[in-house]
Amino acid sequence: MRSFEFFEHTADVGIRAYGKSLEEAFSNAALGVFEVITDTSKVKPIEYREIYLNGYDLENLLYKWIEELLYYYDSELMVFSKFDLMIDQDSMTLEGKAWGEKFNGKIHERRTVVKAMTYHQLSIEKTENCYVITFVVDI
């Protein structure tokens, strides 16, 4: 199973992420976002940021997850390539770690700046075999 793919969207970037679990799908969604920013295969998981979030539904939790990661990119130039998280659907909480390093133009390719997560076309579906997350980021 592929981890994520991009789809065409006028002036923005659409991402479809997949995972056998909700956690894997959220991780792959984040990986897709950072693949827009840089080549994540060159991002070494040498530092981490702990993340604790709560939301009112899964879509809101995903929105907050991506926004939190983008906050670290905006404020510290952190780019991420590895994620370890747990989602509790009863309390609608997410806790985990995002692993990566500070962006370095000598090592990391500068692609496109992701300005923000959006609710446009945001959906989280559970199919027979996996979770499918669809969303659009503002560039």
Curated annotation (Swiss-Prot):
Q: Which terms are listed as keywords in the entry?
A: Calcium, Metal-binding, tRNA processing
Q: Name one GO molecular function term.
A: calcium ion binding
Has UniProt tagged this entry with the keyword tRNA processing?
Answer: yes
Any one of the GO BP annotations: tRNA splicing, via endonucleolytic cleavage and ligation
What Gene3D superfamilies has UniProt attached to this entry? Answer: Archease domain
| Tagged with keyword tRNA processing | yes
InterPro entries associated with the record: Archease, Archease_arc, Archease_dom, Archease_dom_sf
Provide the residue positions that the database annotates as binding Ca(2+): D12, D138, I139
Q: Which family does it belong to?
A: Belongs to the archease family.
Known role = Activates the tRNA-splicing ligase complex by facilitating the enzymatic turnover of catalytic subunit RtcB. Acts by promoting the guanylylation of RtcB, a key intermediate step in tRNA ligation. Can also alter the NTP specificity of RtcB such that ATP, dGTP or ITP is used efficiently.
**Protein's recorded name:** Protein archease
Source organism per UniProt: Saccharolobus islandicus (strain L.S.2.15 / Lassen #1) (Sulfolobus islandicus)
